[in-house]
Amino acid sequence: MGQKTNPIGLRLGINKNWRSRWFINYNTMPENVLGDYELRKFLKKKLYYAGISDIIIERTAKKIRITIFAAKPGIIIGKGGSEIEALKAELQKRIGNKELILNIKEERKPQLSAQLAAENVATQIERRVAFRRAMKKVIQSALKSGAKGIKVQVAGRLNGAEMARTEWYLEGRVPLHTLRAKIDYGFAEALTTYGIIGVKVWIFKGEVLQRKMNSDDTATPERKAPRRRKGRRNVNAKKN
């Protein structure tokens, strides 16, 4: 199943956390799920050139906290904070009367972000760069930044071929079945004259060891030895 499922969803609760965090009534869940989707779609489109690697949305009864991880946070903030104030005003119209808390954080190693790597490959394909060259360039930059392994896959009418096909490159290790492996996953689409080309990227950053359990939890139950009767055995009883 590791080869088929989304590696982020497969590792939720192990070494990955949810991107939408809230506890609400069951009846209002569809509304909030749709609201989070619309907010992410709006932010990704508006802040595309800022290099958005992740968006985390936290909701309470009266507040919404949005944390944006970007490779170029200066584009979002703007000169003197003018751009971020305009962004807050647009987001406030979308969320209504709830209090908005907007945090902008810098992606310290954008080369190790699978989402940014996938968008980079898609952008180069749209600019008519050879897809193999774009894939190899992303792989080299990720390995130089400390990645243990990376896999890049493209699918579609590559180079304008009549029949769609899938090609991929793999460097290093990408253990998708190992749940303790810290694997980042990203997906992007390249819009070309021949159709849409899908790009998927898996980046293996190392293994995350779980916290050591208490000695009481890990100790195996010991077998109790049978109790021996006190006193000497009557050897002559069997003979008689």
Curated annotation (Swiss-Prot):
UniProt GO BP: translation
SUPFAM superfamilies given in the database record: Prokaryotic type KH domain (KH-domain type II), Ribosomal protein S3 C-terminal domain
GO cellular component: cytosolic small ribosomal subunit
Listed Basic residues bias regions: 225-240
Residue ranges, compositional bias (Basic and acidic residues): 213-224
Region named Disordered: 213-240
Keyword terms of this UniProt record: Ribonucleoprotein, Ribosomal protein, RNA-binding, rRNA-binding
MF GO annotations: mRNA binding; rRNA binding; structural constituent of ribosome
Stretches assigned to the KH type-2 domain: 39-108
Pfam annotation, one family: KH_2
Gene3D superfamilies on file: 3.30.300.20, Ribosomal protein S3, C-terminal domain
Role description: Binds the lower part of the 30S subunit head. Binds mRNA in the 70S ribosome, positioning it for translation.
Subunit structure of this chain's protein: Part of the 30S ribosomal subunit. Forms a tight complex with proteins S10 and S14.
Family: Belongs to the universal ribosomal protein uS3 family.
Official protein name in the record: Small ribosomal subunit protein uS3
Organism field: Nautilia profundicola (strain ATCC BAA-1463 / DSM 18972 / AmH)
